[in-house]
Amino acid sequence: MKVKFLGSFFEEFPPPDYPEVVFVGRSNVGKSSLLNMVVGSKVAKVSKTPGRTRAVNYFLLDKKLYLVDVPGYGYAKVGREEMEKWRKMMERYFKERKDNIKMAFLLIDAVAGVQPLDEQMIEWFEYYGIPFTVVITKIDKASQSEIAKTLKQVKRYVGDGAIVLSSAKEGKGKKELLSRILN
């Protein structure tokens, strides 16, 4: 698998020459880590500090697909003005690219569970007709009861087939995610 970083975009996005797979979720849910795990190399910058990803980052996979790492929503160590700027950028991204998005991976932390902003994101995907899969992340850090609780929450919104359990640290879920990306 060959992955090339195309750049960080704030205003204009790359031409919609390839279908897009976008990684979406709350700040610090593991979007960049998951992207790195899926492609097998550290192409996306990772940080323990919420809000590290501040632009829409595009990666070209095998010259046939864009992988898109977007800023997280919710808590981040930035001011309200910066958060509002991100919100507008994300809204513009989804409105402009909705027809180009092949799949959105909505990442939900196994310990934190479904939060109100996650519910809003699901509603947004449904409104815009964007296909999505919920990826329950950081299962290596969660107890079985926390995972079960989060699974139960997620199943209220999506069927069993639209859920992947993952751990970027342990490589869990990679096969299922690659299958959804490449097919």
Curated annotation (Swiss-Prot):
Binding site for GTP: 25-32, 51-55, 69-72, 137-140, 166-168
Domain of life: Bacteria
One cellular component term from this protein's GO annotations in UniProt: cytosol
Known role: Necessary for normal cell division and for the maintenance of normal septation.
The organism of origin for this protein: Aquifex aeolicus (strain VF5)
Stated name of the protein: Probable GTP-binding protein EngB
Names of required cofactors: Mg(2+)
An example Gene Ontology molecular-function term: GTP binding
